[in-house]
Amino acid sequence: MVTLGTLKYGFERLIHRLLEILPADAEVLWQSGSTGVGGLGIEGCESMPEDELAAAMREADVVVSHAGVGSALTALEAGRLPVLVPRLVRFGEHVDDHQNQIATELESRGLAVNVTPDALDLETLLVAAASRVVTGSEVGC
């Protein structure tokens, strides 16, 4: 599953990179936010109710997300090691680079993979898909 949040800024760099590296037969749920996906051969939904997004993340093999706090925490609560791709201000994807700080901190704690669109590859997705995060409910908290 791919989630780009609901920001007014597009994140075309990530969509285009995923289309380059994903196998043609990959089944992907694209929550594309305001990122235009017309003409790309995919069906994106602009937004999803929070409970549906959480359920989709629990069912997904891998979660690729912008590095928004809500998306990252929802993926972790679903037991997924999210692949976080921060939006960057220099590409007009956000107002500042706080998503880079979020992704860097989560990766330093072993709670996410932080990667740029250019460095994202299939191997990264496979490693994240093979990983799980233990949630509080699983350890009796």
Predicted features and spans:
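C-terminal amphipathic helix plus adjacent low-complexity
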Residues: 26, 30, 123-141
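Short active-site oxyanion
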Residues: 27, 59-63, 110-112
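Catalytic binding pocket for nucleotide-activated donors in carbohydrate/polymer assembly enzymes
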Residues: 81-117
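Short acidic-hydrophobic, aromatic-tinged amphipathic segments that line or gate anion-handling sites
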Residues: 44-47, 112-122
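A donor-sugar binding/catalytic signature common to diverse glycosyltransferases
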Residues: 53-95
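Short acidic active-site motifs
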Residues: 51-53, 121-124
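Donor-nucleotide binding loops and adjacent catalytic segments primarily
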Residues: 1-59
